[in-house]
Amino acid sequence: NNRLTVAYNPDAPTPKKWLQFLSELLQPEDIPTLQEFLGYCLLPTTKGQKMLMLIGKGGEGKSRIGLVIRSLLGDSMNTTSIQKVESNRFSRADLENKLLMVDDDMDMSALPKTNYIKSIVTSECKMDMERKGVQSYQSQLYVRFLCFGNGALTALHDKSDGFFRRQIVLTTKDRPAGRVDDPFLVDKLLREKEGIFLWCLDGLHRLIGNNYQFSISGKARENMETVKRSSNNVIEFLQSEGYIRFKADSEASSKALYEAYQRWCEDNAQKPMSANRLSSELAQNERLYNVEATNNVHVGGKRVRGFMGIEVVNPLPY
C-alpha cells in the first residue's frame, strides 16, 4: 500500500519557490521531462519504461529534488545505490512495494552487469527476491530509479541499445560562481508541498495523455547519443573519416574492417573492443548505415564474411 504523505488540496497555490529552483537548475525545455517523471513516480506502474539521470558537475543542488520527493512519497521511497541494486542479491527485496529509489551520489564506475536494472525498469514479470534467512520468493517490482551524479551510467560489457534506451539523461546548468547557497532551501520548498504535488500530478496527466511517452528535449536526446558514443567507441569509429567509406557498390571483409578499427583505436588512444562487437554493431544497424552482412566477400580467391556497402580506405595488404 503506497499511501502518499501529502494532502490533495486542489486550491494549493502555485509552488513559486520550487519553480524558481528548477529554473536555476535545468534548461526550460527539460523541466517538463522532470515533471512527468516525478508524476510517473506517484503511480505503481512501470509503463514508462525509463529511469532518470540528473547529471551535473557538483554543487548545483540537484539532490534537493530527492529530499522534496521524499516528503511526498514517505516510506514509498528508498535511497540506495544503483550499483548495489545490480550486485547485491538482497538489495532488490528492499525495493518491493516502493514507488521510487533515489541514488543521490551515483558511483561513476561502469556496471559489470545490467540484467537486474534493465528488468526492474521495464518490470514486465516477477523476479526472485531474497531476504536474509528467508526462503526466496517471486514478486513484481514497480519501483522507478532517479539518479543524481557527475556523469552518466555506463556498463562494462552491455553496449546494447536496450541499456541506453531505458535512460533519460538531463544535464543541469552550471552553478553560478558567486551564488550563496540557502541552507534553509529545502524547508522553504517543503512549505509548498501541496502545490508541488499538484505540479507533479499535471506531469502525470500529460504523461498518461501521451501514452507514457516522455517529453524529451533535443538536448536530452543529444546527451543520450553522447553517452552512447563515449561508452561504445565502435559507433565513433563508424562515424569517423579516413578509415572507412560507405558506398553502395563496395564491400569489405570483417577482418579488413577490424584492422581499420584497430588503426583508428591506436590513432585515437582508444581501447579496441572485440571483432565480434564491431561486426554485431554493423549487423544490428544495417539500415542506419545502408550495409548488408554477407558471407560472400571475395578476398584472394576465397569467400569470407564481411559487409556490402562499406569499404576500407587504404587497407593493409593481404
What annotation goes with each model-predicted range?
Residues N1-Y318:
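Feature primarily recognizes SF3-like P-loop helicase cores of small DNA viruses
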